[in-house]
């Protein structure tokens, strides 16, 4: 993609609870747009965990949707991961490379102010579809309990209110991947 005389190298942030299609959308956008890199915040969490311990950072060593208080757990993890996530974004900016960062840890309070090509919060689909997506192709070995699913729905409600508060668009992924890709191609920020 060219933007003027230089290649356009967008940075895209995709937030949302588990099962909203973040990984699938990121993969499709990379293919459609020829983007250079994609990373999920779950993988960033795994790297940070490798430099810590359950004694030092107990909240890092479990899924947010398995916590007794999933919202508090998500906020703690998100705050702890922010320096590592920002390092990835800053490296992409410094090197002039395109990047998609996707994951539940991209809270609007922490990232809505960033100058990126697009920042969207993916919405959970209706309940039965959401339950089925939680064990979809990008997480084939993940086992989900009814409690995990209910917590993922709570996180979705929290992220919806945060997206509204910070002016981050919330999108339900259906057959609209081309529309999202076009928004990124044009370099039109998804937030104000």
What is the role of each PLM region?
Residues 157-192:
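NTP-dependent small-molecule kinase module
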Residues 25, 29:
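Hydrophobic positions on the alpha1 helix immediately C-terminal to the Walker A/P-loop
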Residues 117-158:
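A glycine- and Lys/Arg-enriched "phosphate-lid" helix/loop adjacent to the NTP-binding pocket
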Residues 37, 49-97:
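Conserved nucleotide-sensing/catalytic segment adjacent to the nucleotide-binding pocket
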Residues 14:
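Hydrophobic anchor at the beta1->P-loop junction of P-loop NTPases
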Residues 21:
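Conserved glycine(s) of the Walker
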Residues 30-41:
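Post-Walker A helix-loop "phosphate-sensing" segment adjacent to the P-loop in P-loop NTPases
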Residues 17-18:
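The conserved Walker
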């Amino acid at each position: 993609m060219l933007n003027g005389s230089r290649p356009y190298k967008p940075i895209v942030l995709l937030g949302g609870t588990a099962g909203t299609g973040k990984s699938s959308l990121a993969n499709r956008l990379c293919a459609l747009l020829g983007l250079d890199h994609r990373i999920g915040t779950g993988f960033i969490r795994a790297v940070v965990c490798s430099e810590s311990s359950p004694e030092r950072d107990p909240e890092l060593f479990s899924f947010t949707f398995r916590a007794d208080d999933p919202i508090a757990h998500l906020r703690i993890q998100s705050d702890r991961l922010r320096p590592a996530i920002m390092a990835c974004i800053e490296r992409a900016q410094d090197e002039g490379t395109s990047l998609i960062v996707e994951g539940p840890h991209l809270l609007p309070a922490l990232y809505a102010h960033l100058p990126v090509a697009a920042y969207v919060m993916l919405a959970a689909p209706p309940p039965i579809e959401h339950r089925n997506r939680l064990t979809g192709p990008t997480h084939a070995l993940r086992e989900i309990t009814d409690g995990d699913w209910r917590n993922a729905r709570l996180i979705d409600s929290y992220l919806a209110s945060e997206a509204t508060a910070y002016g981050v668009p919330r999108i339900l992924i259906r057959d609209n991947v081309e529309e999202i890709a076009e928004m990124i191609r044009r370099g039109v920020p998804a937030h104000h």
